[in-house]
UniProtKB/Swiss-Prot annotation:
Residues that coordinate or bind NADP(+): K88, D111, N138, Y234, K238
Domain of life: Eukaryota
Principal EC category: oxidoreductase
Keyword annotations from UniProtKB, A to Z: NADP, Oxidoreductase
InterPro entries hit by this protein: NAD(P)-bd_dom_sf, SDR_fam
Function summary: Short chain dehydrogenase; part of the gene cluster that mediates the biosynthesis of the tetrahydropyranyl antifungal agent restricticin that acts as an inhibitor of CYP51 and blocks the ergosterol biosynthesis. The highly reducing polyketide synthase rstn3, the short chain dehydrogenase rstn4, the cyclase rstn5, the FAD-dependent monooxygenase rstn6 and the enoylreductase rstn7 are required to generate the first stable intermediate desmethylrestrictinol.
MF terms (GO), sorted A to Z: oxidoreductase activity
Active site feature: Y234 (proton donor), K238 (lowers pka of active site tyr)
UniProt family annotation: Belongs to the short-chain dehydrogenases/reductases (SDR) family.
Protein name: Short chain dehydrogenase rstn4
EC number(s) on file: 1.1.1.-
Database matches in Pfam families: adh_short
Pathway entry: Antifungal biosynthesis
Amino acid sequence: MAGYLPEPLRMMVTNPAISDFTSDGPLPYALRQKFTGWPPPPAAADISLASQTVLVTGATSGVGLEAARQLAQLGPRLLILGARNLSKADGVKRQLEQDTPHVAVQVAKLDLEDLSSVDRFVDGLHASAIHLDLALLNAGFFANDDRMTPDGYSSLFQVNFLSTAYLAFRLLPLLQTTTTAPEASPQGPRLVLVTSEAHAWTTFPVPPEPAENSLPILSSFRQKESLGSADDQYYRAKLLLALIGKELSRRLTTMQMATSVVITTPGFCASNFFPDSVMTRLIQLISARSIQQGGALHVFAATAQGPQMHGAYLRDGKPTGLSKFAEGPQGQILQQRLWVEMEQFLAGRGYLLSSILKPSSPLQIDGPV
């Protein structure tokens, strides 16, 4: 019967955490959307991205598009859109340049179902001598299927975690060599990872410590017969993304590096994230946040200043803890094991963390790239 229900109702009805009535549970989550998560909207007079270079992924529709629109209104010198569908991205570019003619918008191909596409995207930024002040990694998706990518991973896992985390690591050198203009990036460069409150609706068996060339966490998403439901693949991918963001922020702090990492979620918004239906529209009307509110939460995560922001997980626009599992002893072990696996994964693709995670002297950029 549940299989005939539209999303996200089916996801709620079949949720294994349905009996969790803490703030992490799915029912409190659904009830909270209309009444919380209203950070003050950024005003150009208070927040300016002048002289900054901003990257947004997943900006051709939904919350990502709205976040890109709101960020453009804050006046960055260059707004880069990483997108799989270049035709849609070009349409967004034209609209943004019409609405904010003082902002240069650049579009580049980025398909998170293809790790080589991530490499080509970042290599293109390097070739253009682009240095980032802000990277908002918003791209993600949900589909109730078990599609695999050409790289051999579950599509849900690769898009929502692996390629996003890989992109984040590869962007770090570009964030660390940012502009030095006085008005640019007073908070320092920032990396924003978009997870989901759904990370709290799952756990993850802690694997044995990985041996050399053994990646038990990542490899578990290559075996179709053991993937589990699409829902749980999505939940676990978002859990892993939150954990890698936490560990990355901790290590950047230890190394006294300038880049701040913020983990955020826009909550349930009235977007095209789920397939369209009359019931879905009704559910959105009753309990979803608006696209504008979701975009504002992204912009808040990208621009809010203060020492409490680095390493923060923002829910409803406020710093809070991750799920009980993520913050507990098993989650902390998983976080460390995941870091080791990502280090090996990067090395397998020719990138050593020791060369990525090192302070670089800021570079002066005289004009738009």
